[in-house]
């Protein structure tokens, strides 16, 4: 039977991608249905209890700048906040927060349940309704049919999921949850390229059985960083430390002795695991010369007895897990509450997606999250928001929402996936972005909030706060440019104590802040110069814009040069082997990827600037230089 109400957008899955997708579509006015196999697990952290990190924190800030939920939820559920790379430049500084799993999940659920235009329904989805290569709805496990104009699949590791502990395995989407077999079979019958990936998680330990006195405490930052542009420190619950310990040679010997029963090393698992979050058995094999590996002992919540030993993800048999855990300093009497495991699951080649995350073969069908080969809550949430927004825009018959690589890490993420695909779980790093000086955490709102407002993602309260901040920053910049200090100024004696070279001529306050030894906060302490602006976030923005103005201008020039050829078209039937000077490797990669434009060709791994120059020379020589008006969706 058909459900009585038809929807604009249906989102399948209530994880990090699904919640952001459903919330985005609903904020934009689309009548949205979120279908999940269990409402109680909406927003659940399946693996590590943390949000953010290098590259990942940037994605969370961007999700937040577009009105998403993740940053606000972690501000309400974060029990330890740190700024990583704090001693480095602003481009690579990143916020990371340890989460109380329950508080975080409750915060997400509260946001979801209070979102207008969003309906929840608990049922697994077994089938898609497809007519004339267009999705028209879904069919649930009990045969109930829901009609929709767009469908977003955010099914995580549930598609054909198989859980491995040693040589034992069973079907599962994650520990305690059933897999999605019927939907996996349905998708495999469609013309998508499909493969298998693997991820894993460590055993959870009972904190009462650990000796924290022999471990190194790792406190959070003080004052605590705030994740959301709408957040504040008053939201944060009680803050507690994490701890650090290490594996040792005995640990490694135990692991080596169990490799003959490892599903990874005996070929039982065929899927490729995450390169940047390897299992402990992978680490001791790949880095055989290392005598120890660091373990971050992370509490799972303020009222939880469980801790997450970050760094010893494993799918070894339980007896080996027990022995390796108890060989670690502080874990000698550890009780394992939940065994570690690996999970193998289906993912679909993201090169079969448009930049909107709509599939190329089925109109109105969008994929987001681990189904596209990514790993991590943050990568999933970013894709979910973009997919949900584009699903709503398609229903509303409006232009798609596509972010360029120079506009957002979201743009880098989706362009990497859609252009190059992935053979292993894809994780975001700042190093993946060519223009990371422009794509900082601190300016995510100035890059994206106005764009979000234009398409309906950003509400009135966020828009008002954003405009207040931007006005404060601009007003202060104008003041600093217009206020001058000369050698006889009343502030000069105090100022000279802060400077390497004393004031010998007239300087604007802006020029003084540009000096390496001077900061905005220091300068504002001088009575006749300060007090400046109270908001530390706006003050940081003022200082960064002044100190990095030259570097930012140069990067903007680079972008302008690149964009001159970004949309230069490559003929669909182009024979790359005829281009003199291209290596066989480059020819093979271009032939396989068939990039539509010079811009897309330049982002294929292994395609050098020299190869791009040869392509442009060839196009010009043969009168083939043409540009497309708009990047294809």
Curated annotation (Swiss-Prot):
Q: What does the UniProt keyword field contain?
A: Cytoplasm, FAD, Flavoprotein, NAD, tRNA processing
Residues noted as binding NAD(+) in the record, renumbered to the chain: 273-287
Binding positions (FAD): 13-18, 125, 180, 370
Cellular location of this protein?
Cytoplasm
Function noted in UniProt: NAD-binding protein involved in the addition of a carboxymethylaminomethyl (cmnm) group at the wobble position (U34) of certain tRNAs, forming tRNA-cmnm(5)s(2)U34.
Annotated GO CC locations: cytosol
Which biological process terms from the Gene Ontology are attached to this UniProt entry? tRNA methylation; tRNA wobble uridine modification
Major location category of this protein: cytoplasm
Name of the encoding gene: mnmG
Indicate yes or no for the key word Nucleotide-binding.
Answer: no
Q: Record's family?
A: Belongs to the MnmG family.
Domain of life from the UniProt record = Bacteria
Q: Which GO terms describe its molecular function?
A: flavin adenine dinucleotide binding
Q: What is the lineage of its organism?
A: Bacteria, Pseudomonadati, Pseudomonadota, Gammaproteobacteria, Alteromonadales
Assembly description: Homodimer. Heterotetramer of two MnmE and two MnmG subunits.
> Pfam families, per this entry?
GIDA, GIDA_C_1st, SAM_GIDA_C
The record's section on Gene3D superfamilies has: FAD/NAD(P)-binding domain (3.50.50.60), GidA associated domain, C-terminal subdomain (1.10.150.570), tRNA uridine 5-carboxymethylaminomethyl modification enzyme MnmG/GidA (1.10.10.1800)
User: Which cystines does this chain contain?
Assistant: none
Q: SUPFAM superfamilies this protein is in? A: FAD/NAD(P)-binding domain
Q: What is this protein called?
A: tRNA uridine 5-carboxymethylaminomethyl modification enzyme MnmG
Q: What cofactor does this chain's UniProt record say it requires?
A: FAD
Give the SMART domains listed for this entry: GIDA_assoc_3
Q: Which residues form a coiled coil?
A: none
